[in-house]
């Protein structure tokens, strides 16, 4: 932690202005808004830029001073006073102890006063601080920059404001307009207020979700390093004046030790809240859950996927510091240990900075819970990993009673709402069913394809199972293509699954298969068949769901999963856990957050099975709780499952416990802007390699009983949803 504190101090020194030449940001902001009102655009730029720099410089000054004074004047123990118990019998020694304690405190305060100087008087009001946090200066700046023809800066300011205010429709329109202007480049759309730790984390998670563990690792490691620096900065900035919460100072009355307690507990609570602050991003409604531990979760699996078992064990052990009873992580650790060897694995310890962080955090929580229990000063623990023994027994019982009361009231309200909903549903169900039936059940287009299960049979909406999409010979040829591509060195390289260490997978994308075919490493006709089959599935799904807008490929790959024989004993995990394809599923809260790193633009999904000669691997739909199974589908050659990608269709894949499961997984979007670039390249390559008659798919053959209105009993699909994992 010493190195981290030094890094925080050096960053603050670099960011701060020399000496005390820092203007008041509130005055500069006021001058900027006044300039905006009179149309003085250079004045807006001058004052708003200075206001932003001034606020940043004040923050850096406070951070530098508090870090430096804490380093130069630490709280040193009184080594020459003997054991603390002896102070009870020696009033003189106790008084001396107090004097030394307060002497250190006074010296720290004097250090801060000298360091901070006159700028310490610049305190923003709560309202103005909120304006800066909302990034309001950038709203003014983007207009002013545009007016004085500084387009690059206008774009950056607009983007910075929009990141913090994603619901601001006018700014969205401005950004759309900027995108159409000549001279505007993609790199101009940058967030000037981006936090390094969050930027690296989101980039690392995106690469991880795209199954690029080698590229993800450096960003996730950088995110961790930046996190600890940001944490030290946040904690140092908590040591400000006491917040009386409105007009409470008028009635505040406390003796010396109560006043010290109140202020210190407030500071500790602020420091604990850094967990929430650092896990927050302006574009998200809620902070990332278990933000710091999640870094180690991503890293342990990323390291595992690139074959670095030493680091995988270190990160797994670090994660288990926070969640020691996590069964999946314990299972992963046991697997890594078996591969690396018990002796070498036992010498690997959790990361030291994480151990220090956890130890310090638990000590702070103990004090805060003690203050909650004795003085009634509320403390809301931001972490889910806090051990129960840290909380005093009496407080545990009180919280348990409060939770039970809240649950009872919630259940009563819920029951009442269900009664009302049932009445409403009964009134609307009939009309809804008719509406769904009129949408789902379009022609299947090709002879031989049969409708096996519709939404009604699958107990949901916007779901379908079809058989006969391809023949047995085509299934076998595509399976051979996957294995041939794997041995030729494709993008997957025969790695273990990104979702479970108990399976290996081999896969190839359409473009990669065509390129391998062009190079003679796999049969070119097989690669062409793969291309045609994916287009066939796209057309069928588009027709069956009666979509008014064309479906575009978002991502597609042919993948085979093989059970690792020695890893199947007492296996409890899934081949792919329950998820949603275009949002991040929080099963406990029954919500799905549609924001990055989820692939929010995905609208429909499909999976075409190539075989069924394996154990396990069944596909299943669930409710939002990820536990209540609503339908299950057993794979077989030529069987396709299609569904909308939204919250109405959470799904997962059961563990493959024997053999190899092969399938083509496809995701589609209704937005052409998110059409897969690889697909466009694949289209061009097919046109170059094959004659026009070879490129065309077999003639679509509408079947008489599949045209017109759907048959009674057929239902439709409605919404869409998804998750940041390219697996079905």
UniProtKB/Swiss-Prot annotation:
It comes from the Eukaryota. Pfam families: 2OG-FeII_Oxy_3, TPR_leprecan. It is an enzyme of class 1 (oxidoreductase). Residues 712-728 have a biased composition (Basic and acidic residues). This is Prolyl 3-hydroxylase 1. Its EC number is 1.14.11.7. A motif (Prevents secretion from ER) lies at residues 725-728. O-glycosylated; chondroitin sulfate. Residues 698-707 have a biased composition (Low complexity). Its cofactor is Fe cation; L-ascorbate. Keywords: Coiled coil, Dioxygenase, Endoplasmic reticulum, Extracellular matrix, Glycoprotein, Iron, Metal-binding, Oxidoreductase, Proteoglycan, Repeat, Secreted, Signal, TPR repeat, Vitamin C. PANTHER family: LEPRECAN 1, PROLYL 3-HYDROXYLASE 1. It is found in: Endoplasmic reticulum; Secreted, Extracellular space, Extracellular matrix. It comes from Rattus norvegicus.
């Amino acid at each position: 932690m010493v190195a981290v504190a030094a890094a925080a101090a050096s960053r603050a020194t670099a960011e701060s202005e020399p000496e005390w030449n820092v203007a008041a940001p509130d005055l500069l902001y006021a001058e900027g808004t006044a300039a905006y009102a009179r149309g003085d655009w250079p004045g807006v730029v001058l004052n708003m830029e200075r206001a932003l720099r001034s606020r940043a410089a004040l923050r850096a000054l406070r951070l530098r001073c508090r870090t430096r004074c804490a380093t130069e004047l630490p709280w040193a123990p009184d080594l020459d006073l003997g054991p603390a118990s002896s102070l009870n019998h020696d009033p003189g020694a106790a008084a001396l102890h107090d004097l030394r304690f307060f002497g250190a405190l006074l010296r720290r305060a004097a250090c801060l006063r000298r360091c901070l100087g006159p700028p310490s008087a610049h305190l923003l009001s709560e309202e103005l601080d909120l304006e800066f946090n909302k990034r309001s200066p950038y709203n003014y700046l983007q207009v002013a920059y545009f007016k004085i023809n500084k387009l690059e800066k206008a774009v950056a300011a607009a983007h910075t404001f929009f990141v913090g205010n994603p619901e601001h429709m006018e700014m969205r329109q401005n950004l759309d307009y900027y995108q159409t202007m000549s001279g505007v480049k993609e790199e101009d759309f940058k967030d000037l207020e981006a936090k390094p730790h969050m930027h690296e984390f989101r980039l690392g998670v995106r690469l991880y979700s795209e199954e690029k563990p080698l590229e993800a690792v450096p960003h996730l490691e950088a995110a961790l390093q930046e996190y600890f620096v940001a944490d030290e900065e946040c904690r140092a900035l908590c040591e400000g004046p006491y917040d009386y919460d409105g007009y409470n100072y008028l009635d505040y009355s406390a003796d010396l030790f109560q006043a010290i307690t109140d202020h210190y507990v407030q500071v500790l609570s602020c420091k604990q809240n850094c967990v929430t602050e650092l896990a927050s991003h302006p574009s998200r409604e809620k902070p990332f859950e278990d933000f710091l531990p999640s870094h180690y979760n991503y890293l342990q699996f990323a390291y595992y996927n690139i074959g670095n078992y030493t680091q995988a064990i270190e990160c797994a052990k670090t994660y288990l510091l926070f969640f020691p009873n996590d069964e999946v992580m314990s299972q992963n650790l046991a697997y890594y240990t078996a591969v690396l060897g018990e002796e070498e694995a036992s010498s690997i310890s959790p990361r030291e900075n994480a151990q220090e962080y956890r130890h310090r955090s638990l000590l702070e929580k103990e004090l805060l819970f003690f203050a909650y229990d004795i003085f009634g000063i509320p403390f809301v623990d931001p972490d889910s990993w806090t051990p129960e023994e840290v909380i005093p027994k009496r407080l545990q019982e009180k919280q348990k009673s409060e939770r039970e009361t809240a649950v009872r009231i919630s259940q009563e309200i819920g029951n009442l709402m269900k009664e009302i909903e049932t009445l409403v549903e009964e009134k609307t169900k009939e009309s809804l069913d008719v509406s769904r039936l009129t949408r789902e059940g379009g022609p299947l287009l090709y002879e031989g394809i049969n409708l096996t299960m519709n939404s009604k049979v699958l107990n949901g909406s916007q779901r379908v199972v079809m058989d006969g999409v391809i023949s047995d010979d085509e299934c076998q040829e595509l399976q051979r293509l996957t294995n041939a591509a794997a041995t030729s060195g494709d993008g997957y390289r025969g790695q273990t699954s990104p979702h479970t260490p108990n399976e290996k997978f081999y896969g190839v994308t359409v473009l990669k298969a065509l390129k391998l075919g062009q190079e003679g490493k796999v049969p070119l006709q097989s690669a062409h068949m793969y291309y045609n089959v994916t287009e066939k599935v796209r057309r069928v799904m588009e027709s069956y769901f009666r979509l008014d807008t064309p479906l575009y490929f978002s991502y597609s790959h042919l993948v085979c999963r093989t059970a690792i024989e020695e890893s199947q004993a007492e296996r409890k995990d899934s081949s792919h856990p329950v998820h949603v394809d275009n949002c991040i599923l929080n099963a406990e809260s029954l919500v799905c957050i549609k924001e990055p790193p989820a692939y929010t633009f995905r609208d429909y999904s499909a999976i075409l099975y190539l075989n069924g000669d394996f154990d396990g691997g069944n596909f299943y739909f669930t409710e939002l709780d990820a536990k209540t199974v609503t339908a299950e589908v057993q794979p077989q050659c030529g069987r396709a499952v299609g569904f909308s990608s939204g919250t109405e269709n959470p799904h997962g894949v059961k563990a493959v416990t024997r053999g190899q499961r092969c399938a083509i997984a496809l995701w589609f979007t209704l937005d052409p802007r998110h059409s897969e670039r690889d697909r466009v390249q694949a289209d061009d390559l097919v046109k170059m390699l094959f004659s026009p008659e070879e490129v065309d798919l077999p003639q679509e053959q509408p079947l008489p009983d599949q045209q017109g209105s759907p048959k009674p009993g057929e239902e439709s699909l409605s919404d869409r949803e998804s998750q940041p994992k390219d697996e079905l």
